Amino acid sequence: MDIIQGLIQQPKIQSVDETIPTLCDRVENSTLISDRRSAVLGLKAFSRQYRESVIASGLKPLLNTLKRDYMDEDSVKAILETILILFIRGDGHDDLTRGWISQQSRLQNGKYPSPLVMKQEKEQVDQFSLWIADALTQSEDLIHLLVEFWEIDNFHIRLYTIQLLEAVMATRPLKARSALISLPTSISTMVSLLDDMHEPIRDEAILLLMAVVNDSPHVQKLVAFENIFERLFSIIEEEGGLRGSLVVNDCLSLINNILKYNTSNQTLFLETGNLPKLAHLLSEPISQDEVFFWNDQRIVNINTALDIVSLTVEPGNTVTTKHQNALLDSSVLMVVLRLAFFHNIPKKVRPVALLTAANMVRSNEHAQLEFSKIDVPYFDPSLPVNSTANGGPIKLIPVVSILINWMLYANSVHTFDTRVACSRLLKAYFMDNFDLQRDFLLKQVQLCNNSTNNVGDNAKENGGSNKSDKESDSDKDTDGKDGTEYEGSFKANLFEVLLNYDAELNLNPFKLFFTTDIFMFFFQQDHKYSEELREITRNVTTGNDLEDEEPLKAIQTISELLTTSLTAADIRIPISYLTFLIYWLFGDFKATNDFLSDKSVIKSLLSFSYQIQDEDVTIKCLVTMLLGVAYEFSSKESPFPRKEYFEFITKTLGKDNYASRIKQFKKDSYFSKVDMNEDSILTPELDETGLPKVYFSTYFIQLFNENIYRIRTALSHDPDEEPINKISFEEVEKLQRQCTKLKGEITSLQTETESTHENLTEKLIALTNEHKELDEKYQILNSSHSSLKENFSILETELKNVRDSLDEMTQLRDVLETKDKENQTALLEYKSTIHKQEDSIKTLEKGLETILSQKKKAEDGINKMGKDLFALSREMQAVEENCKNLQKEKDKSNVNHQKETKSLKEDIAAKITEIKAINENLEEMKIQCNNLSKEKEHISKELVEYKSRFQSHDNLVAKLTEKLKSLANNYKDMQAENESLIKAVEESKNESSIQLSNLQNKIDSMSQEKENFQIERGSIEKNIEQLKKTISDLEQTKEEIISKSDSSKDEYESQISLLKEKLETATTANDENVNKISELTKTREELEAELAAYKNLKNELETKLETSEKALKEVKENEEHLKEEKIQLEKEATETKQQLNSLRANLESLEKEHEDLAAQLKKYEEQIANKERQYNEEISQLNDEITSTQQENESIKKKNDELEGEVKAMKSTSEEQSNLKKSEIDALNLQIKELKKKNETNEASLLESIKSVESETVKIKELQDECNFKEKEVSELEDKLKASEDKNSKYLELQKESEKIKEELDAKTTELKIQLEKITNLSKAKEKSESELSRLKKTSSEERKNAEEQLEKLKNEIQIKNQAFEKERKLLNEGSSTITQEYSEKINTLEDELIRLQNENELKAKEIDNTRSELEKVSLSNDELLEEKQNTIKSLQDEILSYKDKITRNDEKLLSIERDNKRDLESLKEQLRAAQESKAKVEEGLKKLEEESSKEKAELEKSKEMMKKLESTIESNETELKSSMETIRKSDEKLEQSKKSAEEDIKNLQHEKSDLISRINESEKDIEELKSKLRIEAKSGSELETVKQELNNAQEKIRINAEENTVLKSKLEDIERELKDKQAEIKSNQEEKELLTSRLKELEQELDSTQQKAQKSEEERRAEVRKFQVEKSQLDEKAMLLETKYNDLVNKEQAWKRDEDTVKKTTDSQRQEIEKLAKELDNLKAENSKLKEANEDRSEIDDLMLLVTDLDEKNAKYRSKLKDLGVEISSDEEDDEEDDEEDEEEGQVA
């Protein structure tokens, strides 16, 4: 039976997870094709719903079967279809393969959509499709197999393979393309698919070719050579041309992809006869054969066709002109222009047509000429399409004028792209054609001047139309009424828009934008002829001579129009004016002069830039930029000179504000939102008004981005320096050419020098051989040389004596300088003592004035203070005795004081560093305080919430107990009255307890702050008491002091006048140092006080932190105090920021002044030498006067010491009396108010003292001016020294430059260090703040947890109480209905209050979140600041490296110059030596001649041989003379060359060189005379030859020869004498030269030393000035802070006193009320006890008493909680509680 049932049962249904693997297994492993095919079809069925599992387990089997069964068409079709489904299915639940017909925008090519179109619309590829693509492209065999499937005739297989390859190209384009290219026949077969008869295959092949060709130049070339253009144009014709569907667009876009970025394909396209086809295609909408109706697809088709045209003429290629000519010859340009100016063309097509025409015309003169000949019918492009078709007669107008008209007046949002295209076409028409630009501007100027002429004539003049007479006649015929109206409406002039005022410009603001854009195009600086075009526009004038108006130039009129349009409704109008002016003025000096000629415009622009309006940010920034550019390119000769203009701007604007405005323009204005892409202007965004967001021209954007650094740093340039224009690329090329020429010349010179060097070496070898011969003759000259040495030794001794005398003089000078310095230091010390004495006199005078005023007030209160005066008179005696004792102690204290002053001066520097560290700690503590205050606010808010909740619950309990008692007392009238009183008492108790707790908290906080102020108050009260006690003393001593002060005052005034007269004549170079040291000693005490205050503050903050962690009460108490401190700290921070900014400005001004002074120093250095003598005489006189002043100062010091002793004695007596009078302070509190008034008078005196300090600062400035004057004189004297030492001026200048660069390096390094320190401090502060935040967050979280636990406890208690109250309600329901109603109403009110409190809690939580967000913002801003400072550090480091490179270059230049000078000197010395050697050789030759003549006398028979020897020697001498002459000539040439180099390097050596040259010329003359004499000797040699011939004939001629020899001897002797004289002269010249060189070296050394000293002194002075400026600023800031703190302390004391009085009054009143209420309670309780005894209804009373006991227990709990919280409960209340408990016990017993 079981077997039968198993057979009968149905088989189990197999799941999908089981079937798919089985199918995959069948596909891979089954042997029969039919089984594999059926398995593939099964997978195909599952592929739509179970895509993931099919891909995971069936992709490899499918691909393997495809390779195996590629011959079976059915299986191939099934496999390809399944893979396509898996590709296209998509990730989501929707099947994209089936719902695609409704989604796609094109017709469906077969069963499945094209994957490329899906990718374009979906724009995402899922992971599974990538998996399939990787599997297909893993080996190239699969791609090759798919290409082979195209040869199969089956439609479905071919279509599915194309779609599969599209899918692979969509997912993995690079791999698929490389696999296709690897097969040689793949592209040809792909292109052959275009000829397929099936349209789906053709369309999908077009899409596949688009993907394969895109961005692949190799494939582009392969496709282009497959005759693809003819095939595509034939497909376009079959589809109907531009009227066709998406297939036409696909064909055109495929052509576009083939031609893109491929010039060879472009030339092939143009040369293979495709232009007529393209022209025919484009002319279809214009043809009159058929009416052309437009739709979206046709617009897309024509735009892609126009894109093909513009691709062939891309700008920048070498083939563009050729292509432009081809397009012009094939009439494509005319077709495109007809499209652009055809009235039926849609608005989306017209701008594209205009842009393509611009590309065809750009930079082609032939095309531009042909373009200018075209006339076009006018119509308005902003009107609808069919409105102008039937609108009357047609008026022909030149193309240029209609383009200008459309650009300016086609005012519609929809035609903005046509306006842009018109401007582009105009620019292309004028591009690289200067003649057209010039003629156009001249005609525009004529039209502007002749504005009364007809517009039609203007149009003809502008465009230059070349129409025949017939056409003009036809135009005249068409003119009529309509023609006149038309001419009046037509406008095409740029100057009218630019220079005429238009009230309706707000309606068409882009009219001005486009005009300025075209003028900027004309004014491009890269343009060669831009200057001439600028001149033409600059000379255009406006204004009528008839109306007596001055004609204004173009820039002046534009600037006036700018001032009128600054507040225009549309912001584009002033922006276009401002950008145009900035572009014009930049680099144009003439234009800046025209702009600066009208000062009223500049003033109005400056006033506008400082109007307080937030909306005009871009305009204000552009106005400041215009002013800065005008300054950058102004000059001394401009109508508003450069220096005056600089001062005028910086007074109101300032450098920092200017730079910040330009940064703001770049980051926070409309400029920051500009899209840098040039084509973005064609499709701009729209603003709120509907206009496009286009504000700036591309030319202005380019200029600003390229020259932002120069524009930003315009005001930082020196006004005394003339501006430099921008260096063009052409000038750089010229310099490079010159550099190459010079390099070639240098190489040629090097070759020449090498050749000359070789020649000279050969000559040197010959000369060395001769030198050996001449060494023997040198011994003869030693005798003469010894005599010269003796003379030289005598001269050396004389030189030594002179040098010794010079050294003595220099030593004397040094001694005098040291004495002068010592005298000056003494003078300064005396001056400082005088200033101190003057200050002490002033303080005494002020003290007298205050004493007199106090005396008057004291005399008024004598009647009241009579009794006190008797006691004070007794105390006066004790005070006088103490005064005597204190005078003795005073002398000791003076000695100790002098020692302390020395030690204090040493400690000042250390304390300054400590102050800096304390300031840094203070800043950190401020940050901590701010964070703590925020957290305290948060915690206090939570505390208030919790306490309010507790109070509300307490009030509920109290009210409910009152209700229960009122219900019990309703039974009896007596109990009702008593319980009403008890309610009032309990309410007052609760309120009083709450108020007491609040007041106690306030009192605690006040007491803590009072303790902080008691120290300061005690010091003030001590001073007040001292003043009180000194009044009586001073009244007695007043007359004596007045008499003494009058006499001393007269003496002091006389002495001061004498000292001032003497000090004015003396040098006051270092007065500032002494004065500032005295000021530092004065401020030392103030700084110590500040340190103490800061330490106290630090201790207070630490105590507050500890108390905040211990208990939450103290947080609330200190909250208000911390808020006040926070406000004060914020004020201090703002004040410090303002002071820092002012100090920075002062530093910049001081640096400028210092630079000016350094420039003036050079002028005054020449006068120092003359005035040094005068000063030396005056110093001797001043020394005598100083001795007298020293004696007088000593006497003054003694008097001051006596006065100080008296003051100290008075102070000590007052302190002793203060200890005695502490008991009388309470009685004298009334007099404190009067003394406060006196304090106010003292404050006024302090202000007067501050004014006196300011007057002293003025005096210090005057003394600084005198110092500067004398420094200038010193600089003049140094100039005189330099005048004698100008021989090495260039070397010194280079040294100065290097030193300047080093100084700048040092300054930059110091700035870097400061910034690094700031960054480190910021980082440290940030770390500290973060650690504190984390710590406070932890504490706050813990406190929150505690508070939440308390809340939960309270909630539980409230629930328990509510349950108890509900029980009581049930009991009370038996009572009256009125009581229940009241009870319910009160409960509702309480619930409303709870809701209100919850809302307040939510608001506070939001505030806490806001504070957290602000903290995060602050941290982010700190991070940004750190990043900015790090970037600035990097830039500074780069600048430092550049400066170091400059220094190394300058050092190398200096070394090269020194080497050149040394080489020149050595060459001169060598030349002189060679000349001397040649002369010595001549002398030796003459001596040989003498010896030979003597031998001839002895041996007449050997005369022939001797004559031969003489001839040989003469010839050798002649050759030697010739060589010497040549060497001398070469030396002369070298000397001239060396002269030129020396003149360039050292100009002042010319005089010495001229002397040397004159001497050399004399020596040359002597040499020439010697030559002439030698020639005579040569002639005598010829006579000797005649004698030889006649010797055999006659002996008489021998005698004649002997006589002639004697004559020669005499001549030779004369020559020898002359040679000796010349040698002596040469030696003397050499000695003089050596002396001069030694003198030069000494002068150079002295110059270097003086320069080093001057530089050191200047650096020291600068450092001292900077130190004193910093110290002065710090002291001023500290004085201001102390004054503010003093005022705050006074105000706080008054406020505290008021608060204390109010608190005392309230506490007293409350205590009185509590006592009254306690008494009433006692009475009521006594009455209650009596009533309870007398009451009969014992049962009800027992119930009520039980309720009362419960309530009393709850009250006891709440009191215990109040005690835990710190609220004190009076003893009376506790007694009442005990009494109540006793009464309750008695009641229970009863």
UniProtKB/Swiss-Prot annotation:
InterPro entries: ARM-like (IPR011989), ARM-type_fold (IPR016024), Uso1_p115_C (IPR006955), Vesicle_P115 (IPR024095), Vesicle_Uso1_P115_head (IPR006953). GO terms for biological process: endoplasmic reticulum to Golgi vesicle-mediated transport; Golgi vesicle docking; intracellular protein transport; membrane fusion; SNARE complex assembly; vesicle fusion with Golgi apparatus. It comes from the Eukaryota. It holds the Pfam family Uso1_p115_C. ARM repeats lie at residues 45-89, 127-170, 173-213, 215-260, 261-312, 314-362, 363-429, 431-512, 543-584, 586-630. Residues 467-484, 1194-1209, 1485-1512, 1519-1547, 1655-1667, 1722-1738 have a biased composition (Basic and acidic residues). It is a peripheral membrane protein. Residues 1-724 are annotated as: Globular head. Keywords: Coiled coil, Cytoplasm, Cytoplasmic vesicle, Cytoskeleton, Endoplasmic reticulum, Golgi apparatus, Membrane, Phosphoprotein, Protein transport, Repeat, Transport. Residues 452-484, 1185-1221, 1326-1351, 1485-1547, 1645-1667, 1722-1742, 1762-1790 are annotated as: Disordered. Residues 725-1790 form a coiled coil. Composed of a globular head region and a rod-like C-terminal coiled coil domain. The rodlike tail sequence is highly repetitive, composed of a heptapeptide repeat pattern characteristic of alpha-helical coiled coils. May form filamentous structures in the cell. Required for protein transport from the ER to the Golgi complex. Belongs to the VDP/USO1/EDE1 family. Homodimer. Dimerizes by parallel association of the tails, resulting in an elongated structure with two globular head domains side by side, and a long rod-like tail structure. This is Intracellular protein transport protein USO1. The lineage of its organism: Eukaryota, Fungi, Dikarya, Ascomycota, Saccharomycotina.
